[in-house]
Curated annotation (Swiss-Prot):
Protein name: Elongation factor Ts
Pfam families: EF_TS (PF00889)
Listed GO MF terms: translation elongation factor activity
Purpose of the protein: Associates with the EF-Tu.GDP complex and induces the exchange of GDP to GTP. It remains bound to the aminoacyl-tRNA.EF-Tu.GTP complex up to the GTP hydrolysis stage on the ribosome.
Subcellular location per the Swiss-Prot or TrEMBL entry: Cytoplasm
GO CC terms: cytoplasm
Family to which the UniProt record says this protein belongs: Belongs to the EF-Ts family.
Keywords: Cytoplasm, Elongation factor, Protein biosynthesis
Region (Involved in Mg(2+) ion dislocation from EF-Tu) location: 82-85
Length: 292
């Protein structure tokens, strides 16, 4: 069994917001397996322990562009190493120009985007020059483009959350949808779009919690299904309560406005990226080695 160190307990607490003693107990039960300990906490403490999915550490910015005719748009994520660089005007300008380039040139992937003409060189040579000027690594992580006969709306929150929405209806509806998505971070439009692995994971947790109730099997089955359906309502856009009027779901709001939504793209900076960290002693040793 792996040693249950204070650092391991601290890491689990930061991932889950669970009490320190509960983290230690979970790690002991999981024999030091961090992922298993997190699952144990979810069963014991409920969905508060799922905050790990939303905790990200990579820095960078989201860029958005919508053409003047409102028929094509793009969202892009570009990462850097520190928040300080994310506020650099050259970095911001680079991202905004990349978003426009994606919308107008429709590259197939990051490699194709990197090869496109940009200024006096290419996107890649410009990126390399910017790395040299700023002194930090910069990477184009992902982008998505939408071309539509309908309408597009976008919203960026603090440069860290970006939303692009394809919809039909009044301009105000598009703005409301984009802001709502940024606030609630749905996984999909409806249940059909939710990743099967996410549903399976939620069902597994629900089954373990329901089994601990000691109730008859038929009741346990209903409890599990109820938990899964509740999860799906929480993470699917059309089922969510509208943030500006929680007495309506998004689906009801759209029907009332005579509007519809076809697609949305949601990017959160650093989502799914784990930033490598070193303990203080290691940092001092590395610095000393660098001076030697």
């Amino acid at each position: 069994m792996a040693e249950i160190t204070a650092a391991l307990v601290k890491e689990l607490r930061e991932k889950t917001d669970a009490p320190m003693m509960e983290c230690k107990k979970a790690l002991t039960e999981a024999e030091g397996d961090l992922a298993r300990a997190e699952e144990i906490l979810r069963v014991k403490l409920g969905n508060k322990a799922s905050k790990a999915a939303a905790r990200v550490t990579a820095e960078g910015l989201i860029g958005l562009y919508i053409a003047a005719d409102g028929k094509q748009g793009a969202v892009i994520e570009v990462n850097c190493e520190t928040d300080f660089v994310a506020k650099n005007t050259d970095f911001i300008d680079f991202i905004n120009k990349l978003a426009e380039l994606v919308a107008t040139q429709n590259p197939g992937d990051v490699a194709a985007l990197s090869a496109l003409p940009f200024g006096e060189g290419t996107v890649e040579t410009t990126r390399t020059a910017l790395v040299g000027k700023i002194g930090e690594n910069i990477s184009v992580r992902r982008f998505e483009r939408i071309q539509t006969p309908n309408s597009l709306a976008s919203y960026v929150h603090g440069g860290k959350i970006g939303v692009l929405v394809e919809f039909s209806g009044a301009e105000e509806v598009g703005k409301d949808l984009a802001m709502h998505i940024a606030a609630t971070k749905p996984k999909a439009l409806n249940a059909d779009g939710v990743n099967a692995e996410d549903i399976a994971a939620e069902r597994s947790v629900a089954e373990q919690k329901a089994a601990e109730s000691g109730k008859p099997a038929e009741i346990v089955a209903k409890m599990v299904e109820g938990s899964v359906q509740k999860f799906l309502k929480e993470v699917t856009l059309l089922s969510q309560p509208f943030v500006k009027n929680d007495k309506q779901t998004i689906e009801q709001m759209l029907k009332e406005k005579g509007a519809s939504i076809t697609k949305f793209v949601l990017f959160v900076v650093g989502e799914g990226i784990e930033k490598k960290t070193a303990d203080f002693a290691s940092e001092v040793a590395a610095a000393a080695a660098g001076r030697a």
